[in-house]
């Protein structure tokens, strides 16, 4: 599936190594390969955006290696493709040898997978399912500041799905563990791939059922009910968390205005 980059090859370039992304001038490179010293490297086309190919190049650059979070303000599709590239690069880097027999592996030519040349085992990129949920109580929404968000951003609750657990069970468990409350009338909204590091966010809306807020201090700095027209600093547009909050605000406006 991959090939040697030629001088006139062009498009968007996802140059990644160890979950980092090359961002010269803070931007995702776009243009001809020769402009970015990529001629002769191996590249894998991982998608297309606005009629232009999006290429993955597995390479470490000496400068300007950053986080895919830095391009979160891109068009949502291009951001997802950049995230795909970072995840695939890490998958290929970390699966050079078979976990069963220890022999060298090689990439499949027909799908995103690594194949063992000895025992024929097949490996696919790991995807970690997560839940994220907006909880409404009358004219208010539950928002929390996570320990990893020291910039004042408040968002909805989220967490990883555990082995042997349904998405609905994961919502109930995560909400109880992080905030101490129970929810009801759970409704699926949408999903979003989230490359931090390899998550698939499944988004829900729910209604408050019972209980008082008691936060898990290992996860949250605080959690409170916020009236829909008096909200703190929110996640950026384009994130599924922001969509859940905006959808909840729209429901409150329709009912209370």
Curated annotation (Swiss-Prot):
Domain of life where this protein originates: Bacteria
CDD domains in the record: NUDIX_NADH_pyrophosphatase_Nudt13 (cd03429)
Q: Name one GO molecular function term.
A: NADH pyrophosphatase activity
Q: Name one GO cellular component term.
A: cytosol
Q: Which residues bind a divalent metal cation 3?
A: 174, 178, 219
Question: What are the binding positions for substrate in this chain?
Answer: 25, 69, 111, 124, 192-199, 241
> What GO biological process terms does the UniProt entry carry, in alphabetical order?
NAD catabolic process; NADH metabolic process; NADP catabolic process
Q: EC annotation?
A: 3.6.1.-, 3.6.1.22
Where along the chain is Zn(2+) bound?
98, 101, 116, 119
| Free-text comment on the cofactor | Divalent metal cations. Mg(2+) or Mn(2+).
The short sequence motif called Nudix box sits at 159-180
Q: Which UniProt keywords apply?
A: Hydrolase, Magnesium, Manganese, Metal-binding, NAD, Zinc
Q: Which cofactor does it need?
A: Mg(2+); Mn(2+); Zn(2+)
Binding positions for a divalent metal cation 2 per the UniProt entry: 174
Q: How does it assemble?
A: Homodimer.
Q: What does this protein do?
A: mRNA decapping enzyme that specifically removes the nicotinamide adenine dinucleotide (NAD) cap from a subset of mRNAs by hydrolyzing the diphosphate linkage to produce nicotinamide mononucleotide (NMN) and 5' monophosphate mRNA. The NAD-cap is present at the 5'-end of some mRNAs and stabilizes RNA against 5'-processing. Has preference for mRNAs with a 5'-end purine. Catalyzes the hydrolysis of a broad range of dinucleotide pyrophosphates.
Which NCBIfam families does this one have? PRK00241.1
Which family does the UniProt entry place this protein in?
Answer: Belongs to the Nudix hydrolase family. NudC subfamily.
Query: What's this protein's name?
Result: NAD-capped RNA hydrolase NudC
Q: Tell me what organism the protein belongs to.
A: Shigella boydii serotype 18 (strain CDC 3083-94 / BS512)
Organism classification, top ranks?
Bacteria, Pseudomonadati, Pseudomonadota, Gammaproteobacteria, Enterobacterales
Task: Report the gene name.
Answer: nudC
């Amino acid at each position: 599936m991959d090939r040697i980059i030629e001088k006139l090859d062009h498009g968007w370039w996802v140059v990644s190594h160890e979950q980092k992304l090359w961002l010269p001038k803070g931007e995702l490179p776009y243009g001809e390969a020769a402009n970015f010293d990529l001629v002769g490297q191996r590249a894998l086309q991982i998608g297309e955006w606005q009629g232009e190919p999006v290429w993955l190049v597995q390479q470490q650059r000496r400068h300007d290696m950053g986080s895919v979070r830095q391009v979160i303000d891109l068009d949502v599709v291009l951001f997802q493709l950049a995230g795909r590239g970072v995840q695939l690069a890490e998958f290929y880097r970390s699966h050079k040898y078979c976990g069963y027999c220890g022999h060298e592996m090689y990439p499949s030519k027909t799908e995103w997978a690594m194949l063992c040349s000895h025992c024929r085992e097949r490996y696919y990129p790991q995807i970690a399912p997560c839940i994220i949920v907006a909880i409404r109580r009358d004219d208010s929404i539950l928002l929390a500041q996570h320990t990893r968000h020291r910039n004042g951003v408040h968002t909805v609750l989220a967490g990883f799905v555990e082995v042997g657990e349904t998405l609905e069970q994961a919502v109930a468990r995560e909400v109880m563990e992080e905030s101490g409350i129970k929810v009801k009338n759970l409704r699926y909204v949408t999903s979003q791939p989230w490359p931090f590091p390899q998550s698939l966010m499944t988004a829900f809306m729910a209604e408050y059922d019972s209980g008082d807020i008691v936060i898990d201090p290992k996860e949250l700095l605080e959690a409170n009910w916020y009236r829909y027209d008096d909200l703190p600093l929110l996640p950026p547009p384009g994130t599924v968390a922001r969509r859940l909050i905006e959808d909840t605000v729209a429901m409150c406006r329709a009912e209370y205005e």
